[in-house]
């Protein structure tokens, strides 16, 4: 009996070496599909990448989305004051169907899918975010 117990305890010591998953905190699990904004004016690209991760489960990042934005004559990506139309065109270039709607808060609270929303507390500084009801 003692040999069996020793063998069992010995086996338990090496069990963590064979674990093939990492333990994640609740915050890590909650934010695993979140794409953080890397540049001052790239909230639209980060929000679109987050939305794609949530809906299509593709690992799209912000830089990948920025490649689909309109470029200026020098080939630079313009992220200054991005509109819904530009985000819609980028999504369509990536192969997604998209549409823009204006709705009041009451209708917004009834929607049960993630949405990309433009916040305009100050019209000079619009901001894009993803909301999940």
Give the label of every model feature segment.
Residues 2-4, 14-69:
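Active-site-adjacent structural segments surrounding the nucleophilic cysteine of cysteine proteases
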Residues 21-28, 34, 67-133:
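Conserved active-site-adjacent core of cysteine acyl-enzyme catalytic domains
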